[in-house]
Regions:
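Secondary-structure capping and boundary motifs in well-ordered enzyme cores
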Residues: 36-39, 43, 77-84, 148-155
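Post-signal peptide N-terminal segment of secreted/secretory-pathway proteins
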Residues: 85-136, 163
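Carbohydrate-binding/catalytic loop surfaces
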Residues: 63-79, 126-148
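Internal, well-ordered domain-core segments that constitute the primary functional module
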Residues: 133-172
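Low-complexity, Ser/Thr/Pro/Gly-enriched N-terminal "stalk/linker" regions
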Residues: 26-77, 124
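Bacterial N-terminal signal peptides that target proteins for export
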Residues: 1-8
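C-terminal motif of bacterial Sec signal peptides marking the signal peptidase cleavage site
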Residues: 16-19
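Well-ordered alpha-helical scaffold segments within catalytic/enzyme domains
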Residues: 29-39, 50, 86-101, 116, ...
């Protein structure tokens, strides 16, 4: 197994090294590189877009997975994740702060999320790892794991606490 891992690592290294050359064979010029600020802007905006535009329509929460081709062999396109949604909520707050959407639009999304969570399955206060976003019913994480997930609940609560602090003085 170690040899196989070594061979795969070497193959990846060789392929990566070959792919790094530009067409002229000369080093890239500084003008073709992103500045740190431009890179940060790009990462923040695209992260925001994933959670904003990619949200499950009913719940407003983050999808468990995204298939670029739109084909979901397990018919799970509407499955949402609790922990990933916590991260998504914080990304939306960053998007509001960066001006990608207004505070009002962000608040409307948060209200949709909280309304969903009020009715969604939970277990002694803990949310499951996954739900069906259209129903709020738990999607079992495994054969013997169909209840609350404390770690994922903590990630979700982090996001909701951040929302509380962000809007604590109103929507201004």
């Amino acid at each position: 197994m170690k040899k196989l891992s070594l061979y795969i690592s070497l193959l990846c290294l060789i392929l990566t090294a070959g792919a790094c050359k530009n067409k002229t064979g000369r080093p890239a010029t500084a003008s073709s590189e992103l500045t740190d600020d431009a890179l940060m802007d790009t990462v923040q905006h695209r992260t925001f877009l994933y959670f904003w535009e990619g949200a499950e329509p009913n719940s407003g929460l983050a999808p468990e997975r995204y298939h670029v081709d739109g084909v979901y062999p397990q018919n799970d396109a509407n499955v949402v994740t609790s922990g990933g949604s916590g991260f998504g909520i914080m990304a939306i707050l960053a998007g509001i702060d960066r001006g990608y959407v207004t505070r009002e639009e962000g608040l409307a999304r948060m209200e949709r999320i909280v309304s969903f969570l009020e009715k969604a399955d939970r277990f002694h206060g803990a949310y499951p790892h996954w739900w069906y976003g259209d129903t709020g019913k738990v999607k079992p994480f495994g054969q013997k794991d169909n209840g609350g997930d404390l770690v994922e609940t903590a990630f979700l609560m982090q996001g909701l606490l951040a929302v509380h602090q962000y809007y604590i003085n109103g929507n201004e």
